[in-house]
Amino acid sequence: MSEFIFHMAGSGNWRKYFSSEAFYLLYERIYPEGINLKKLNGSDRDIIYKCEKVAFVEVKDNFVNPKIPLFTEPDYKKIEKWLTKFEKDYLKVINKHKEEYYSLARLISDEEKIPEEYIFTILLCAYTLDAGTLEKLEDGILGRPPSREDSGKYFLWGEKIAISKNYFGVNTYEIPQNKLFSVIWMPEIRRSFENINSLTIPVFNSSVMEKIEKLYSSTSEELAQVFSSSIEKIKLNELSFANCSLKDVFCMLFHIGYSYVTDSLIEQGILSDFPKEITDSWGMWIWNK
């Protein structure tokens, strides 16, 4: 069984072509050095040809080069100093704005009758550290997620080592009447919407969203600038993903970096700890499109 966990950022379903364990095991086998196509059996070559269509690998002169980065423990050791500096620079920006976040969280909490610290987590983690900063990076150093045939448009990366205890992301779904439903997801948490009779979650109207967007947009811009300038200090040629797709590499490092920062925010008491056991409504909210 493969030890890697894959993540994506964007829209679509990367597992559309690669739902079997055979893909994971093959990719782990050829990463990072690559492999001569002639050394693979027929079923493995079929997987490689599928991977090539969605730019997971590059096949040139009968040699297979893996293009999706995988983060390993040796990689972590080589960028640990970078992560520490990155964390410090991110925290400087967050501390500069945190009172504004507390104030807005308090305002929304009073209106929604939802705990203030929960609203604060949504504002800082979901809107700012994740979606807001990623949006700014897509306007700059990242560009838009690459098209992967009919499986969607997304960045993709894998991890063999989880350096953060609080890795998270945000998924958004459309619901009727011009509303959007969002949820903070974490890999270790499995949710089921079956047999749920009611949910107590915040609903952000257009007036609230205007305040939220104004706050996270400016903060995310600063964080994106920190990431973009700091990434230049990483010696990519020394890492396992040196020859992988640069966009996927940058997206991976962005997600690893902000999750690392999240741990620090929790340790310092700025953020409440993510629950080990959650209700089905934790990390969910509805907002105007």
Name each model-derived stretch.
Residues 26-44, 210, 214, 218-225:
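Short acidic, hydrophobic short linear motifs in intrinsically disordered regions
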Residues 1-26, 195-206:
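Short alpha-helical segments that sit at the start of domains
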Residues 66-105:
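Short, amphipathic alpha-helical interaction segments positioned at domain boundaries
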Residues 57, 76-83, 163-169, 177:
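Active-site ExK catalytic segment of metal-dependent nucleases
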Residues 37-61:
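Short amphipathic alpha-helical interaction segments
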Residues 7-12, 58-80, 210, 225, ...:
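Accessory beta->alpha helical hairpin/"wing" motif in late/C-terminal subdomains of nucleic-acid enzymes
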Residues 26, 75-78, 84, 116, ...:
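Beta-strand-rich cores of mature extracytoplasmic or soluble domains
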